[in-house]
Amino acid sequence: MRIVVLAGGTSTERDVSISSGLLVSAALREKGHHVVLLDVFTGYEKDIFDVDELFKQNYSFTDSASVGDTISDIDEVRENRRDKTNRYLGENVIDICANADITFFALHGGEGENGKLQATFDLLGLKYTGSGYLGSALAMNKGLTKSVLIQNKVLTPRGEIFNSPEEAADWKIFPCVVKPCSGGSSVGITIVETQEDFKNSVREAFSYGETEIVVEQYVKGREFSVGVVGGKALPPIEIIPKTGFYDYKTKYQAGAATEVCPADITHEQDGIMRSAAEKTYEALHLESYARVDFILDKGNNAYCLEANTLPGMTPTSLLPQEAAVEGIGYADLCELIIKNSLEKYNR
């Protein structure tokens, strides 16, 4: 097949996305596919080119990525764009994707994951991997996610949505968790113990360009993630941070957390989380693949924290680790995601 892998973009998770895109591209090429790796934001900045040659050459906009403990410098990315515009889709992206059998979204956060890009591709009749615009929009907004989970009787921590720091000022439940409403990779998320720290955390959450934040009760317990591929849950993986909680730095720095899969849990606990993950996947109208995060307390209550419609595919990412336990190698997982995604177009 001819496949475009879209990565990069302008979200705070840009570097993670590029790392995912490079690995996905390499894996699909190993499987014999012709793959073009594009930065969704900068695109392919040439006025005259041969699309067929791009696929034959397995063109890639970069051959390296570095995921550090800080987020990407998006202003620098925008400054280096040839046309100097702020449009999300870079030059020639749509034209090249239109010449592919399918586009693999190796994007994380922002317009690549919030349903806007999915809706654009739907309108243009272009095939892509992952959830559609509805599921993407619901899962990207943590406030909407919480509302849908409550309506579908999926356990989730008690929380509220606030539109300004002033609105949040009356929150009295501590410890609590403060989250940007639409961020990913735990960027801007803080666990708060006191009212004074709460004010600072709220300001930080709003500093990421958010118009809403979610504040929820902190649930003490073990942290797990459950991948769902084709509607079926994979084995839960336990995340044990060496310090603090599972934030951006811990997620993408090798050795910052211990990740155990298969997890040291009972058959009952395994079933509780797999069932909740599949129920979340269905309630949020997710498709092809996703990852659902949980806190499991001492009473075996699995609290759903969020769903990720475009899980990371980096060397330290959770979904590939879970798939490996089921005997699904990395390249096979990439092909399975494409197979599951194509099925919705053949219905």
What are these regions (language model features)?
Residues 238-290, 321-347:
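Active-site "cap" helix and flanking loop/linker of ATP-utilizing ligase/carboxylase catalytic domains
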Residues 193-275, 296-303:
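Phosphate-binding site of ATP-dependent enzymes
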Residues 217, 226-228, 281-313, 323:
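Conserved metal-phosphate-binding beta-hairpin within the catalytic cores
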Residues 3-7, 11, 15, 19-22, ...:
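Active-site nucleotide/adenylate-binding loops and adjacent lid/helix of ATP-dependent enzymes
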Residues 1-134, 138-140, 144, 163-168, ...:
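ATP-binding N-terminal substructure of ATP-dependent carboxylate-amine bond-forming enzymes
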